[in-house]
Amino acid sequence: MTDSDEDALKVDQGPSQDIPKPWVIPAPKGFLQHIFGTSQVFQSICDVKPKVTGLTVPLKVREYYSRGQQCLEQADWETAVLFFSRALHLDPQLVDFYALRAEAYLQLCDFSSAAQNLRRAYSLQQDNCKHLERLTFVLYLQGQCLFEQCAFLDALNVFSHAAELQPEKACFRYRCMACLLALEQHPACLSLITEELKQDTTNADVYILRARLYNFLQKPHLCYRDLHGALLLNPKHPQARMLLQKMVAQAQQARQDAGILAVQGRLQHALQRINCAIENNPLDPSFFLFRGTMYRRLQEFDGAVEDFLKVLDMVTEDQEDIMRQAQRQLLLTYNDFAVHCYRQGAYQEGVLLLNKALRDEQQEKGLYINRGDCFFQLGNLAFAEADYQQALALSPQDEGANTRMGLLQEKMGFCEQKHRQFQKAEDHFSTAIRHNPQKAQYYLYRAKSRQLLQNIFGARQDVATVLLLNPKQPKLSLLMTNLFPGMSVEEVLSTQIAHLARLQLERMVEGSLQAGGPQGIVGMLKQWELERQKALALQHSWKQGEPLIETSEKLQATPEIPQVEPGSSEGQAEAPKEEEEKEEEEQKEEEEQKKEEKKEEKKPKLTPSKVASLSESYLDQTSLASSMSFRTTCTSETETSAICQEYRSTSATAMTFSDSSLLKTQSSDSGNNREALSHGPRKIKDIQGQRQSLSKTQATQSQRQNFSKTKAAAHRRNSSKTKATQGQGRRSSKTEATQGQRQSSSEIETSQGPRQEPSKTKTTRSPRQRPRKVKAARGRSWRPSKLDATQGRRRGLLRSSTKTEAFYDSNWSLSKTEDVQGQGQRTSKAEAAQGKSRGMSSTSSKAESTWGPSPSVSKTEVGQDLTYYEVL
C-alpha cells in the first residue's frame, strides 16, 4: 500500500503547483473578532492550519483495505465487498482489490460477480496465472451448481467457457459431455468424445462412455469395439465387464429370435436379428454360421461364402463341430450358387463353382450330378457321363442319376445314329435302358437301331416291350407295320416275343429294386408288399395250372411208355383185348398206307396250300434265322393229316435224341398228332386261349426234358402210333416237338445212332421218314383223319381233347421258358415240323412191331402218302 500512497500524493502535488490561485481581497485583521466579539468559540476557525499535501487518497485506500480484510476475517462478506468496492472506486487500477472482492462474492455464492472480478483482474494482469486458475475454478463451481439445478444448457455454457480458458484440463470437457447427454444431444456428445479420444487414448473410462453411447444408439459393433479397447487398457475394469455381459445377453436373445423367425420362414427378419446378435458379440462363430445359412437360403451367395470363410478363420481346435458345419454349408453354398448360375445359363461358372466344392468333398453325389448337368448343357457329353458314373458309384440306386444317365445315353445314341454308327447307338440305348428300364422311348430307339443292323428278333422284342410299357408311344405304328405287318396290338402281345419281353422287363425292374435294397421302414414295407403280391400271383397260377400239372405228373409217371417192350410189366398190365385190337388196327393202317402210297406216286411234290399265322411265322423266322440253316414252311391241312398218321408210327424213334438236343420248341407233328388223337377237330385258336402261365410252362418244360432224356437212354424207336400208345400212351409224341435248336441234319442223324443211314432226305425219325420243311402255326386249324379219330375211340386210352389241347398249348411257350432257364437260346414257338411219309407194308409193320429198322422211302412214296390223306 506504500507505493499506492506515494502515487496518490504525486498526483495531488501536480495540480497544486500548476493551477494558479485566484486573487481574493484579504480580510481585514480583527474582522472576525469584531463579528463574534469576545467569544472564544469561533476563534479557532480563524486559525490557519498547516495543509497536508499528497497523503489524502492513499490513506483512504489503505483504510478501506484494512477494514475489508477485517471483514473477511470476521466472515462479514457483504461489508468486505463494500470496503473493497470503495477502494476500487478511489483507484480502479488496484488488481488485488478485484481478487479480494471476488473471494467475498464467492463466499456469498455470487459466482457471476466473482467470475467478473476475476476476469477483470486477469485482464489487468494476464501474466498472472493464479487469477486464471481461480476464474476457471469459479466457473466450474458455477456450472456444477447449474447442472445440479438441471439448468443443463447454462451449465454447458459455463463449462464450455472454462474449457476454452483452460483447454488442457479434460474435466471441463467431461462436464460438457455430461451436459450434452443430459440434453440428449447424442451426436454432439459423440463428436466431443471422439475429439477427446484423439487427444487422449489411454483413458478407459472414455472408451466405456462412448461404448455406452453406441449401445444406446443401437450400434453394438461400435460399442463392442470401444468395450474391447477399454478392456485392453484395463482388463479388470468393472464397468467394462458389466457392459460386456450385457452385450452377450443381448446377442443370445437376438440369436433365439432369429431362429424362431427362420423356422417361421421370415428370413429377412431373421437376418436382421442375427445381424444384431453379431454386432453385440462379434466373436461368436456360430452367429456367422447362422447368418451364412440365412444368406444362402436368400440366395445371397457372396455374403454366405464370406461368412462361412470367416467362421473357418475364427474357429478353434475345440470347435470341430462348428467347423464341419461351416464346411458343409460352404459346399452347399457353392452348389446352390452353381444351380443359380445353371438357371441363368452361366454353365461355365457353375462348373467352376462345383470344382471348388469337389476340391474339398469327393463323396457327395449331388455335386457330381450337378456338374454333369452343366457339362451336358455345354455339350461335353464325355465329362457329363464321367460325373454321372461317379454319382452312380456313390449311390447306384439314385433315381436322379439314373434318369440323367438315361437321357445322356439317349443323346449319345442319337449322335452315333447321325454318324451312322448304329452298333454304338444300340449300345448307348441299351445302357439307357439299363439305367431306366421303364422308359418306353429307349426301347423304341433301340428297335430302330436293331432294325438297321438287321437284328429283327431284337427289334421285335423291343417293340413288344414298348407295347407293354406305353402302347400309345408316338412313332410306334411305323415300326409295328414294318416288324409286325397286319397284326394288331393284341395279337403282338399274345406272341411268344411279347412273353419274352415281359419276362425280361420284369427281371430288369426287379433286379433294380433288389439291388437298391430297402431304405428304411418304407422300403421294407414296399419289399414285403412285393413279396406278398408274388406269393398271391404264384398261388393263383397254381390254381389255374391244375390240368397242366396233372398232365405233367402223368407223363413223369410213365416216362417210357413209347419204349415198352411186349414183355414189360406195363405191357402185361394192358388187357389182352386191347392187344388184339391194336393188331387189327395195324393191319388196317398198313392197307391204308399202301393205298396212299399209290396215290402219292401219281402226284408231284406238294406245295404249301395254307399260310401259318403271322405271329408264328414272324417268330419262327427270327429265331430260326439266327440258329438254323434252313427255313420252315407251312403245310396244308391234308399234309398235316398225313404227318399225323406217320407220326403215330414213328413217335418212339423221335425220342432217341441225346441230351444235347434239349426240348426247346414244338414241331407241327406233335400238334397234328394231338389233334388226331382227339375226339373231334379243334382249332389252335381255341388252344391259344388256354395258354398257361409262366410257372406252368416251366414245370411242363422240366417234365418234358426228363421225359426226353429217359427216352434217349432207351435208344428205341416205335414204328407205329399204335405201338406208341400201348400202356397209358398219352401225348408221348408231344415231347418230340422240342427239337428246336436249328440242328443240322447231320447232327440229328448222329444222335439217332447207327440205325440211320444218311440219305438225301436227311431222315431224323426213322429210315422211312423224310423231314419236310414245315412251319408250325398256332393259328391254323388242322383236320384229323377219320382213321385217327376211329383209332382214338377204339383204344380208349386217350385223354379228352381239352386236356390234350391244354398240354399242347403249354408247349408253345418253350422259347420263353428257355429264356427263364438262362440258356440264352433264341427259339421259336414252333420249330420246323419234319414231314413224314410212310409206305408201310405188312413186312414193315412187323419190323416196326419188333422195333427193327426199315429202309428209307423215296420222295415218290411220300407224295403218294400225302395224296392219299388229302383225298380223305
UniProtKB/Swiss-Prot annotation:
Give the TPR repeat ranges: 61-94, 96-128, 136-169, 251-284, 285-318, 331-364, 365-398, 406-439
> Which regions are flagged for Basic and acidic residues bias?
591-604
Range of residues in the leader sequence: none
What keywords are annotated for this sequence in UniProt?
Repeat, TPR repeat
What PROSITE patterns does this protein's entry cite? TPR (PS50005), TPR_REGION (PS50293)
Q: Where is the composition biased (Basic residues)?
A: 762-783
Compositional bias ranges of the Acidic residues kind: 577-590
Name this polypeptide is given: Tetratricopeptide repeat protein 16
Q: Which organism is it from?
A: Macaca fascicularis
